[in-house]
């Protein structure tokens, strides 16, 4: 699967640097 950032999107954004929201999961760029 895709490398995730270990975080879910909050208000469509991710707090982890260089991560992008693909709701509801944050993925590495």
Swiss-Prot record:
There is a cross-link at residues 1-29 (Cyclopeptide (Gly-Asp)). It comes from the Eukaryota. GO terms for biological process: defense response; killing of cells of another organism. Keywords: Cytolysis, Disulfide bond, Knottin, Plant defense. It holds the Pfam family Cyclotide. The keyword Membrane does not apply. This is a cyclic peptide. Signal peptide: none annotated. Disulfide bonds join 5-19, 9-21, 14-26. InterPro entries: Cyclotide (IPR005535), Cyclotide_moebius_CS (IPR012324), Cyclotide_sf (IPR036146). The presence of a 'disulfide through disulfide knot' structurally defines this protein as a knottin. Probably participates in a plant defense mechanism (Potential). Binds to and induces leakage in phospholipd membranes, particularly ones containing 1-palmitoyl-2-oleophosphatidylethanolamine (POPE). In vitro, displays cytotoxicity against cultured cells but no hemolytic activity towards fresh erythrocytes. Belongs to the cyclotide family. Moebius subfamily. This is Cyclotide mech-2. It comes from Melicytus chathamicus (Chatham Island mahoe).
């Amino acid at each position: 699967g895709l490398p995730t950032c270990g975080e879910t999107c909050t208000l469509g954004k991710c707090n982890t640097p260089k991560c992008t929201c693909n709701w509801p999961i944050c993925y590495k760029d």
